[in-house]
Amino acid sequence: MKNSARVSSVLSPVRSPIVIAVAALVTVAAALAAAGPPAADVGPTYAIRNCRIVPVTGPPVEKGVIVIRDGLIEALGPADKVKVPGDAEIVEAEGLIAYPGLISALSNLFIEQPAPARTGAPAAETEIPSLAGQAAPAEDRYPPGPGQLVLDQLKPKKATVESFHKAGFTTVLVAPARGIFEGQSVLLNLNGEPIGPMVLRNGAALHINFTTERGGYPSSLMGTIAHIRQSFIDADYYAARQAQYAKSPAGLKRPEYDPRLEALVPFVRDRKPVVFQCNNQEDIKRALKIAAEFKLNALLAGANEAWRAADALKKSPVPLLVGLDFRPPATSKYATQGEDLRKKAEAEIYPANAAELAKAGLDFALVSGAGADGGTVLRAVRTAIKAGLGKDAALIALTIQPARFLGLDRALGSLEPGKIANVVLVKGELLDDNAQVAKVFVDGVLFKYAEVSK
Protein backbone atom coordinates (compact mmCIF):
# COMPACT_ATOMS: atom_id res chain seq x y z
CA MET A 1 0.00 0.00 0.00
CA LYS A 2 1.18 3.50 -0.73
CA ASN A 3 1.20 5.70 2.31
CA SER A 4 3.65 8.33 1.16
CA ALA A 5 3.33 12.07 1.43
CA ARG A 6 1.82 12.12 -2.04
CA VAL A 7 -1.57 11.60 -0.40
CA SER A 8 -3.10 15.05 -0.43
CA SER A 9 -5.58 16.35 2.12
CA VAL A 10 -9.02 16.18 0.60
CA LEU A 11 -10.85 18.14 3.24
CA SER A 12 -10.51 21.89 3.48
CA PRO A 13 -7.74 23.26 5.75
CA VAL A 14 -8.52 23.05 9.47
CA ARG A 15 -9.61 26.35 10.99
CA SER A 16 -10.29 27.17 14.66
CA PRO A 17 -8.80 28.85 17.70
CA ILE A 18 -6.75 25.81 18.63
CA VAL A 19 -3.13 26.48 17.67
CA ILE A 20 -0.96 23.43 17.25
CA ALA A 21 2.22 23.91 19.29
CA VAL A 22 5.61 23.04 17.85
CA ALA A 23 8.78 21.47 19.10
CA ALA A 24 12.24 21.40 17.57
CA LEU A 25 11.93 22.43 13.91
CA VAL A 26 8.26 21.51 13.46
CA THR A 27 6.38 24.41 11.91
CA VAL A 28 3.14 25.77 13.30
CA ALA A 29 0.19 23.74 12.05
CA ALA A 30 -3.11 25.13 10.82
CA ALA A 31 -5.82 25.78 13.40
CA LEU A 32 -9.16 24.01 13.76
CA ALA A 33 -12.71 24.84 12.56
CA ALA A 34 -13.57 28.47 12.10
CA ALA A 35 -16.64 29.57 14.04
CA GLY A 36 -16.78 26.21 15.80
CA PRO A 37 -17.48 25.71 19.49
CA PRO A 38 -14.71 26.54 21.97
CA ALA A 39 -11.92 24.02 22.49
CA ALA A 40 -12.25 21.40 25.17
CA ASP A 41 -10.95 22.25 28.63
CA VAL A 42 -7.57 20.66 29.16
CA GLY A 43 -6.30 18.93 32.27
CA PRO A 44 -2.99 19.23 34.06
CA THR A 45 0.43 18.60 32.57
CA TYR A 46 1.18 14.89 32.30
CA ALA A 47 4.36 12.88 31.83
CA ILE A 48 3.77 9.33 30.59
CA ARG A 49 6.85 7.34 31.60
CA ASN A 50 8.48 4.05 30.64
CA CYS A 51 6.12 3.13 27.81
CA ARG A 52 6.95 1.80 24.38
CA ILE A 53 5.99 4.54 21.91
CA VAL A 54 4.63 3.75 18.43
CA PRO A 55 4.54 7.14 16.64
CA VAL A 56 3.34 5.55 13.32
CA THR A 57 5.25 8.10 11.23
CA GLY A 58 8.60 7.20 12.79
CA PRO A 59 10.43 4.29 14.42
CA PRO A 60 9.23 2.99 17.79
CA VAL A 61 10.83 4.23 21.00
CA GLU A 62 11.41 1.26 23.28
CA LYS A 63 11.38 3.03 26.64
CA GLY A 64 10.09 6.53 26.28
CA VAL A 65 8.42 9.55 27.80
CA ILE A 66 5.51 11.60 26.44
CA VAL A 67 4.91 15.04 27.94
CA ILE A 68 1.40 16.48 27.52
CA ARG A 69 0.65 20.13 28.27
CA ASP A 70 -2.38 22.27 27.38
CA GLY A 71 -3.90 19.41 25.41
CA LEU A 72 -0.88 19.03 23.13
CA ILE A 73 2.13 16.74 22.95
CA GLU A 74 4.93 18.96 24.24
CA ALA A 75 7.72 16.43 23.89
CA LEU A 76 8.37 12.74 23.39
CA GLY A 77 11.36 10.49 23.01
CA PRO A 78 13.70 8.15 24.90
CA ALA A 79 13.56 8.47 28.67
CA ASP A 80 17.18 9.64 28.88
CA LYS A 81 16.55 12.47 26.41
CA VAL A 82 13.22 13.92 27.53
CA LYS A 83 13.12 15.97 30.71
CA VAL A 84 10.07 15.44 32.88
CA PRO A 85 8.68 18.87 33.92
CA GLY A 86 8.52 19.53 37.63
CA ASP A 87 4.82 20.39 37.46
CA ALA A 88 3.84 17.22 35.59
CA GLU A 89 1.55 14.54 36.98
CA ILE A 90 3.35 11.25 36.44
CA VAL A 91 1.53 8.49 34.57
CA GLU A 92 3.52 5.30 35.09
CA ALA A 93 3.22 3.17 31.95
CA GLU A 94 5.70 0.34 32.44
CA GLY A 95 4.63 -2.57 30.24
CA LEU A 96 2.24 -0.44 28.15
CA ILE A 97 2.44 0.65 24.51
CA ALA A 98 1.49 4.20 23.48
CA TYR A 99 -0.33 4.64 20.17
CA PRO A 100 -1.91 7.68 18.51
CA GLY A 101 -5.67 7.65 18.96
CA LEU A 102 -7.41 5.79 16.17
CA ILE A 103 -9.55 7.73 13.70
CA SER A 104 -12.74 6.50 12.05
CA ALA A 105 -13.36 8.68 9.01
CA LEU A 106 -16.98 7.52 8.77
CA SER A 107 -19.49 6.53 11.46
CA ASN A 108 -23.03 7.18 12.66
CA LEU A 109 -22.02 7.70 16.28
CA PHE A 110 -24.58 9.48 18.52
CA ILE A 111 -27.30 9.64 15.84
CA GLU A 112 -30.31 8.83 17.98
CA GLN A 113 -32.75 7.58 15.37
CA PRO A 114 -31.69 4.70 13.11
CA ALA A 115 -31.63 5.38 9.40
CA PRO A 116 -34.74 4.22 7.51
CA ALA A 117 -34.42 0.95 5.60
CA ARG A 118 -33.27 1.23 2.02
CA THR A 119 -34.54 -0.73 -0.95
CA GLY A 120 -31.08 -1.52 -2.30
CA ALA A 121 -32.53 -1.72 -5.81
CA PRO A 122 -29.85 -3.25 -8.05
CA ALA A 123 -28.89 -2.02 -11.50
CA ALA A 124 -26.03 -3.23 -13.65
CA GLU A 125 -25.74 -0.23 -15.92
CA THR A 126 -23.40 2.65 -15.10
CA GLU A 127 -24.49 4.92 -17.93
CA ILE A 128 -25.17 8.45 -16.69
CA PRO A 129 -28.14 10.19 -18.31
CA SER A 130 -28.00 13.67 -19.77
CA LEU A 131 -30.43 16.14 -18.23
CA ALA A 132 -29.28 19.51 -19.51
CA GLY A 133 -31.98 22.12 -19.19
CA GLN A 134 -34.17 20.22 -16.73
CA ALA A 135 -34.82 21.50 -13.22
CA ALA A 136 -34.17 19.50 -10.07
CA PRO A 137 -37.43 18.09 -8.66
CA ALA A 138 -39.22 20.19 -6.08
CA GLU A 139 -39.70 17.15 -3.83
CA ASP A 140 -36.07 17.35 -2.66
CA ARG A 141 -35.44 21.06 -2.62
CA TYR A 142 -35.47 21.43 1.15
CA PRO A 143 -34.01 19.48 4.10
CA PRO A 144 -33.34 16.73 4.61
CA GLY A 145 -30.87 17.50 1.88
CA PRO A 146 -27.44 19.02 1.27
CA GLY A 147 -27.87 21.78 3.83
CA GLN A 148 -28.73 19.46 6.72
CA LEU A 149 -26.07 19.38 9.46
CA VAL A 150 -25.88 16.06 11.26
CA LEU A 151 -24.56 17.86 14.35
CA ASP A 152 -28.12 18.96 15.08
CA GLN A 153 -29.18 15.30 15.45
CA LEU A 154 -26.45 14.08 17.80
CA LYS A 155 -26.94 13.09 21.42
CA PRO A 156 -23.68 11.83 22.95
CA LYS A 157 -23.75 9.00 25.45
CA LYS A 158 -21.00 8.17 27.91
CA ALA A 159 -21.28 4.44 27.23
CA THR A 160 -20.73 4.99 23.51
CA VAL A 161 -17.68 7.18 24.11
CA GLU A 162 -16.24 4.55 26.45
CA SER A 163 -16.90 1.79 23.92
CA PHE A 164 -14.85 3.60 21.29
CA HIS A 165 -12.13 4.60 23.76
CA LYS A 166 -11.69 0.97 24.82
CA ALA A 167 -11.17 0.07 21.16
CA GLY A 168 -8.56 2.83 20.81
CA PHE A 169 -10.68 5.38 18.90
CA THR A 170 -10.44 9.05 19.81
CA THR A 171 -11.66 10.83 16.64
CA VAL A 172 -14.67 10.14 14.40
CA LEU A 173 -16.38 11.66 11.39
CA VAL A 174 -20.13 11.34 12.00
CA ALA A 175 -22.26 11.31 8.85
CA PRO A 176 -26.02 11.36 8.24
CA ALA A 177 -27.61 8.34 6.56
CA ARG A 178 -30.97 9.34 5.11
CA GLY A 179 -31.90 10.37 1.61
CA ILE A 180 -29.84 10.86 -1.54
CA PHE A 181 -28.22 14.14 -0.53
CA GLU A 182 -27.88 12.96 3.06
CA GLY A 183 -26.45 16.17 4.49
CA GLN A 184 -23.16 17.27 6.00
CA SER A 185 -21.00 15.43 8.52
CA VAL A 186 -19.21 16.63 11.64
CA LEU A 187 -15.73 15.74 12.85
CA LEU A 188 -15.50 14.97 16.58
CA ASN A 189 -12.74 14.44 19.12
CA LEU A 190 -14.23 12.12 21.75
CA ASN A 191 -13.16 14.14 24.78
CA GLY A 192 -16.29 13.82 26.93
CA GLU A 193 -20.07 13.85 26.99
CA PRO A 194 -21.17 17.41 25.95
CA ILE A 195 -21.17 17.66 22.17
CA GLY A 196 -19.87 21.23 21.82
CA PRO A 197 -16.29 20.74 23.02
CA MET A 198 -15.96 17.63 20.85
CA VAL A 199 -16.38 19.47 17.55
CA LEU A 200 -13.28 19.77 15.39
CA ARG A 201 -15.14 20.80 12.24
CA ASN A 202 -18.83 21.13 11.47
CA GLY A 203 -20.05 20.75 7.89
CA ALA A 204 -16.97 18.65 7.18
CA ALA A 205 -18.24 16.95 4.02
CA LEU A 206 -21.35 16.41 1.91
CA HIS A 207 -22.63 12.82 1.82
CA ILE A 208 -24.46 11.25 -1.12
CA ASN A 209 -26.09 7.83 -1.47
CA PHE A 210 -27.23 6.15 -4.68
CA THR A 211 -29.77 3.98 -2.86
CA THR A 212 -33.22 5.47 -2.42
CA GLU A 213 -35.44 4.98 0.60
CA ARG A 214 -38.52 2.84 0.31
CA GLY A 215 -41.27 5.09 -1.04
CA GLY A 216 -38.82 7.94 -1.57
CA TYR A 217 -38.25 10.16 -4.58
CA PRO A 218 -36.72 9.46 -7.05
CA SER A 219 -37.79 5.82 -6.93
CA SER A 220 -35.26 4.33 -9.37
CA LEU A 221 -31.49 4.22 -9.63
CA MET A 222 -31.45 6.04 -12.96
CA GLY A 223 -33.70 8.72 -11.51
CA THR A 224 -31.36 9.05 -8.54
CA ILE A 225 -28.31 9.50 -10.76
CA ALA A 226 -30.18 12.05 -12.88
CA HIS A 227 -31.24 13.92 -9.75
CA ILE A 228 -27.66 14.06 -8.43
CA ARG A 229 -26.29 15.32 -11.74
CA GLN A 230 -29.02 17.89 -12.23
CA SER A 231 -28.53 19.19 -8.71
CA PHE A 232 -24.85 19.85 -9.38
CA ILE A 233 -25.66 21.46 -12.74
CA ASP A 234 -28.24 23.71 -11.09
CA ALA A 235 -25.87 24.61 -8.25
CA ASP A 236 -23.13 25.59 -10.67
CA TYR A 237 -25.53 27.76 -12.69
CA TYR A 238 -26.93 29.26 -9.48
CA ALA A 239 -23.41 30.15 -8.30
CA ALA A 240 -22.58 31.74 -11.65
CA ARG A 241 -25.70 33.94 -11.54
CA GLN A 242 -25.04 34.97 -7.95
CA ALA A 243 -21.43 35.85 -8.77
CA GLN A 244 -22.46 37.83 -11.84
CA TYR A 245 -25.01 39.80 -9.87
CA ALA A 246 -22.57 40.45 -7.01
CA LYS A 247 -20.00 41.80 -9.45
CA SER A 248 -22.30 44.03 -11.49
CA PRO A 249 -25.92 44.23 -10.27
CA ALA A 250 -26.97 47.23 -12.36
CA GLY A 251 -29.62 46.28 -14.88
CA LEU A 252 -29.86 42.68 -13.67
CA LYS A 253 -32.78 41.03 -11.94
CA ARG A 254 -31.71 39.86 -8.50
CA PRO A 255 -31.31 36.06 -8.48
CA GLU A 256 -33.73 34.25 -6.21
CA TYR A 257 -32.17 32.73 -3.10
CA ASP A 258 -32.38 28.93 -2.98
CA PRO A 259 -31.20 27.34 0.30
CA ARG A 260 -30.69 23.92 -1.23
CA LEU A 261 -28.53 25.16 -4.10
CA GLU A 262 -26.75 27.58 -1.78
CA ALA A 263 -25.70 24.59 0.35
CA LEU A 264 -24.30 22.81 -2.71
CA VAL A 265 -22.22 25.71 -4.04
CA PRO A 266 -19.12 25.16 -1.83
CA PHE A 267 -18.93 21.56 -3.02
CA VAL A 268 -19.26 22.45 -6.69
CA ARG A 269 -17.20 25.65 -6.75
CA ASP A 270 -14.85 25.52 -3.73
CA ARG A 271 -14.02 21.80 -3.81
CA LYS A 272 -15.25 21.00 -0.34
CA PRO A 273 -15.25 17.21 -0.04
CA VAL A 274 -18.09 15.05 -1.31
CA VAL A 275 -18.39 11.52 0.09
CA PHE A 276 -20.22 8.99 -2.09
CA GLN A 277 -21.56 5.91 -0.31
CA CYS A 278 -20.63 3.02 -2.60
CA ASN A 279 -22.40 -0.20 -1.69
CA ASN A 280 -21.04 -2.23 -4.63
CA GLN A 281 -18.60 -2.04 -7.52
CA GLU A 282 -21.13 -0.34 -9.80
CA ASP A 283 -21.63 2.46 -7.28
CA ILE A 284 -17.86 3.01 -7.35
CA LYS A 285 -17.90 3.42 -11.13
CA ARG A 286 -20.90 5.76 -10.97
CA ALA A 287 -19.25 7.91 -8.33
CA LEU A 288 -16.01 8.14 -10.31
CA LYS A 289 -17.94 9.31 -13.40
CA ILE A 290 -19.90 11.97 -11.52
CA ALA A 291 -16.80 13.17 -9.67
CA ALA A 292 -14.90 13.52 -12.94
CA GLU A 293 -17.78 15.29 -14.71
CA PHE A 294 -18.16 17.97 -12.04
CA LYS A 295 -14.51 18.01 -10.87
CA LEU A 296 -15.58 17.15 -7.34
CA ASN A 297 -13.25 16.59 -4.42
CA ALA A 298 -14.56 13.07 -3.93
CA LEU A 299 -14.09 10.29 -1.41
CA LEU A 300 -15.68 6.86 -1.76
CA ALA A 301 -17.12 5.31 1.40
CA GLY A 302 -18.16 1.76 2.12
CA ALA A 303 -16.29 0.47 -0.92
CA ASN A 304 -16.53 -3.16 0.20
CA GLU A 305 -16.21 -4.18 -3.45
CA ALA A 306 -13.32 -1.84 -4.24
CA TRP A 307 -11.13 -4.86 -5.02
CA ARG A 308 -13.51 -5.64 -7.90
CA ALA A 309 -13.10 -2.10 -9.26
CA ALA A 310 -9.34 -1.82 -8.70
CA ASP A 311 -8.54 -1.08 -12.36
CA ALA A 312 -10.99 1.83 -12.47
CA LEU A 313 -9.64 3.15 -9.17
CA LYS A 314 -6.05 3.00 -10.44
CA LYS A 315 -7.05 5.13 -13.43
CA SER A 316 -8.93 7.63 -11.25
CA PRO A 317 -7.44 7.35 -7.74
CA VAL A 318 -9.57 8.83 -4.98
CA PRO A 319 -9.44 8.34 -1.20
CA LEU A 320 -11.26 5.21 -0.10
CA LEU A 321 -13.05 4.98 3.25
CA VAL A 322 -13.25 1.21 3.42
CA GLY A 323 -16.01 -0.20 5.59
CA LEU A 324 -15.69 -3.25 7.81
CA ASP A 325 -19.05 -4.82 7.01
CA PHE A 326 -18.15 -8.06 5.26
CA ARG A 327 -21.62 -9.01 4.06
CA PRO A 328 -21.77 -9.19 0.24
CA PRO A 329 -24.14 -6.59 -1.26
CA ALA A 330 -27.47 -7.70 -2.68
CA THR A 331 -26.18 -6.99 -6.20
CA SER A 332 -23.28 -9.43 -5.85
CA LYS A 333 -23.29 -12.97 -7.23
CA TYR A 334 -22.10 -14.06 -3.79
CA ALA A 335 -25.45 -13.00 -2.34
CA THR A 336 -27.63 -14.58 -5.02
CA GLN A 337 -26.15 -18.03 -5.69
CA GLY A 338 -26.90 -19.89 -2.52
CA GLU A 339 -26.24 -19.76 1.21
CA ASP A 340 -22.94 -21.66 1.06
CA LEU A 341 -21.39 -19.16 -1.36
CA ARG A 342 -22.72 -16.23 0.67
CA LYS A 343 -21.19 -17.57 3.88
CA LYS A 344 -17.87 -18.24 2.16
CA ALA A 345 -17.84 -14.69 0.78
CA GLU A 346 -18.62 -13.20 4.18
CA ALA A 347 -15.96 -15.27 5.92
CA GLU A 348 -13.15 -15.19 3.35
CA ILE A 349 -13.64 -12.99 0.29
CA TYR A 350 -14.94 -9.64 1.57
CA PRO A 351 -12.64 -9.53 4.63
CA ALA A 352 -9.73 -9.62 2.13
CA ASN A 353 -10.91 -6.40 0.41
CA ALA A 354 -8.43 -4.17 2.28
CA ALA A 355 -5.56 -6.61 1.73
CA GLU A 356 -6.25 -6.63 -2.02
CA LEU A 357 -6.32 -2.82 -2.11
CA ALA A 358 -2.98 -2.72 -0.31
CA LYS A 359 -1.51 -5.12 -2.88
CA ALA A 360 -2.88 -2.91 -5.66
CA GLY A 361 -1.17 0.14 -4.17
CA LEU A 362 -4.41 2.03 -3.51
CA ASP A 363 -4.68 4.41 -0.56
CA PHE A 364 -7.45 3.73 1.94
CA ALA A 365 -8.61 4.28 5.49
CA LEU A 366 -10.57 1.75 7.51
CA VAL A 367 -13.84 3.11 8.91
CA SER A 368 -16.35 1.89 11.46
CA GLY A 369 -19.40 2.62 9.32
CA ALA A 370 -22.95 2.26 10.64
CA GLY A 371 -24.31 0.63 13.74
CA ALA A 372 -21.16 -0.83 15.30
CA ASP A 373 -19.71 -0.29 18.76
CA GLY A 374 -15.99 0.11 19.29
CA GLY A 375 -15.34 -3.51 20.17
CA THR A 376 -17.15 -4.76 17.07
CA VAL A 377 -15.11 -2.41 14.88
CA LEU A 378 -11.81 -3.57 16.35
CA ARG A 379 -12.78 -7.23 15.92
CA ALA A 380 -13.57 -6.53 12.26
CA VAL A 381 -10.13 -4.91 11.82
CA ARG A 382 -8.56 -8.06 13.26
CA THR A 383 -10.60 -10.14 10.82
CA ALA A 384 -9.21 -8.07 7.93
CA ILE A 385 -5.69 -8.67 9.28
CA LYS A 386 -6.29 -12.42 9.41
CA ALA A 387 -7.49 -12.18 5.79
CA GLY A 388 -4.12 -10.80 4.70
CA LEU A 389 -3.89 -7.12 5.62
CA GLY A 390 -0.56 -6.35 7.30
CA LYS A 391 -0.71 -5.02 10.86
CA ASP A 392 1.37 -1.98 9.97
CA ALA A 393 -0.88 -1.23 6.99
CA ALA A 394 -3.96 -1.60 9.21
CA LEU A 395 -2.54 0.77 11.82
CA ILE A 396 -1.70 3.35 9.15
CA ALA A 397 -5.24 2.99 7.75
CA LEU A 398 -6.63 3.82 11.21
CA THR A 399 -4.32 6.73 12.07
CA ILE A 400 -2.24 8.88 9.73
CA GLN A 401 -4.06 7.89 6.52
CA PRO A 402 -7.53 9.03 7.64
CA ALA A 403 -5.87 12.10 9.14
CA ARG A 404 -4.43 12.90 5.70
CA PHE A 405 -7.78 12.30 4.03
CA LEU A 406 -9.46 14.61 6.57
CA GLY A 407 -6.83 17.33 6.24
CA LEU A 408 -5.75 16.77 9.85
CA ASP A 409 -2.36 15.14 9.49
CA ARG A 410 -0.60 18.18 10.97
CA ALA A 411 -2.75 17.85 14.09
CA LEU A 412 -3.67 14.17 14.47
CA GLY A 413 -2.82 10.68 13.29
CA SER A 414 0.63 10.20 14.81
CA LEU A 415 2.55 10.87 18.01
CA GLU A 416 4.70 13.94 17.37
CA PRO A 417 5.56 17.10 19.33
CA GLY A 418 3.03 19.83 18.63
CA LYS A 419 0.14 17.53 17.75
CA ILE A 420 -3.10 17.18 19.69
CA ALA A 421 -2.60 14.83 22.64
CA ASN A 422 -4.76 11.90 21.55
CA VAL A 423 -2.85 8.98 23.07
CA VAL A 424 -3.92 5.40 23.78
CA LEU A 425 -2.02 3.27 26.33
CA VAL A 426 -2.41 -0.45 25.72
CA LYS A 427 -1.35 -3.69 27.37
CA GLY A 428 -0.17 -5.69 24.36
CA GLU A 429 -0.29 -4.65 20.72
CA LEU A 430 -3.49 -2.74 19.98
CA LEU A 431 -4.54 -4.83 16.98
CA ASP A 432 -3.92 -8.18 18.67
CA ASP A 433 -6.82 -10.22 20.00
CA ASN A 434 -5.71 -9.99 23.64
CA ALA A 435 -4.98 -6.24 23.73
CA GLN A 436 -6.39 -4.24 26.67
CA VAL A 437 -6.73 -0.45 26.63
CA ALA A 438 -5.65 0.94 30.00
CA LYS A 439 -5.78 4.73 29.59
CA VAL A 440 -6.82 7.16 26.89
CA PHE A 441 -5.95 10.83 26.45
CA VAL A 442 -8.17 12.95 24.20
CA ASP A 443 -7.26 16.63 23.82
CA GLY A 444 -4.96 15.96 26.77
CA VAL A 445 -7.90 14.88 28.96
CA LEU A 446 -7.17 11.60 30.77
CA PHE A 447 -9.72 8.77 30.82
CA LYS A 448 -8.88 5.84 33.09
CA TYR A 449 -10.32 2.41 32.44
CA ALA A 450 -10.15 -0.89 34.32
CA GLU A 451 -6.72 -2.00 35.44
CA VAL A 452 -5.21 -4.31 32.87
CA SER A 453 -4.36 -7.86 33.84
CA LYS A 454 -0.74 -8.70 34.49
Describe the function of each predicted region.
Residues 1-16:
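N-terminal secretory signal peptides that target proteins for export/translocation
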Residues 17-31:
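Bacterial N-terminal signal peptides
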Residues 36-39, 44, 53, 57-101, ...:
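Histidine-rich, glycine-flanked metal-binding segment
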Residues 51-54, 404, 416-454:
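C-terminal cap of metal-dependent C-N hydrolases
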Residues 114, 127-131, 135, 139, ...:
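His/Asp/Glu-enriched, well-ordered alpha-helical/loop segment
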Residues 157-305:
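Polyanionic/metal-chelating signatures
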Residues 291-297, 314-321, 361-363:
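Glycine-enriched alpha-helix->loop->beta-strand junction motifs that scaffold or abut catalytic
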